[in-house]
Amino acid sequence: LPSQHLCGSHLVEALYFVCGPKGFYYLPKBZVGIVEHCCHNTCSLYDLEGYCNQ
């Protein structure tokens, strides 16, 4: 899938899809967070994997 803007519930749904039962986390506000990365800009499914719990 191409990179796309993911905001709000669309972003959460994409994280559940990519991360599955591992779950996911948000980075601290002083770093570039997932909203800045995926909503204000675009991100790919590969980018989303970086926010999954290990």
Curated annotation (Swiss-Prot):
Gene Ontology biological-process annotations: glucose metabolic process
Disulfide bonds: 7-39, 19-52, 38-43
Keyword Ribosomal protein: no
Highest taxon, organism lineage: Eukaryota
A cellular component term, taken from the record's GO annotations: extracellular space
Compartments (UniProt record): Secreted
Quaternary data: Heterodimer of a B chain and an A chain linked by two disulfide bonds.
Protein name: Insulin
Annotated organism of origin: Squalus acanthias (Spiny dogfish)
Lineage: Eukaryota, Metazoa, Chordata, Craniata, Vertebrata
